[in-house]
Design a protein with these regions (language model features):
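A short aromatic-anchored loop/beta-hairpin motif
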Residues: 1-6
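Short alpha-helices
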Residues: 36-39, 43-104
Length: 162
């Protein structure tokens, strides 16, 4: 769980650092995810017919899952746009998935560059936020690192990604 800036939320062992989680032994563990904005965005649209969590690291797989679901319309929820940042890391992800869905050229490096050059990406490069290591930025900008989508299911009051 994380709060703005990537710090671990009270009661959570980890913050919002993918690099820190790479070394964590989580096999067989239930993982509860809480981000500064992404989880709230999912909650806000919990009643959508189909809901996916997405990022550049699984963009192509997400586009394939959307296509397989036969969606006539797709709505992208941009949660990274705040008063102090442009949110282009989220917009780049949406633009990438949209280009794939439309069959348009989608050069991975163009979208990765947008993540690195976004307001939030520059915070990682600056090195002034202890819970925003540069390794996280490189992981976030690794387009199509994973070949799975993250469909979100409703289980009672909870949203679950499996």
């Amino acid at each position: 769980g994380a709060i703005a800036g990537g710090d671990p939320a009270p009661g959570f062992e980890y913050g919002n650092s993918p690099a820190a989680l790479l070394a964590a032994e989580l096999a067989g563990c239930r993982v509860v995810m809480s981000t500064a904005a992404g989880v709230r965005g999912l909650q806000r649209f919990r009643d959508a017919r189909q809901l996916f969590a997405a990022s550049l690291v699984c963009g192509r797989a997400t586009a394939a899952a959307i296509r397989a679901a036969g969606a006539d319309e797709v709505c992208f929820v941009i949660t990274g746009e705040w008063v102090d940042r442009d949110g282009d890391e989220d917009v780049a992800c949406a633009d990438y998935i949209e280009a794939l869905l439309r069959g348009e050229p989608a050069p991975a490096e163009d979208f990765a560059r947008r993540v690195r050059d976004s307001d939030f990406g520059r915070r990682f490069v600056a090195g002034t936020w202890p819970n925003l290591p540069l390794a996280d930025l490189e992981l976030a900008a690794h387009v199509d690192r994973f070949d799975f989508a993250m469909p979100v299911a409703r289980e009672g009051e909870h949203l679950v990604i499996r």
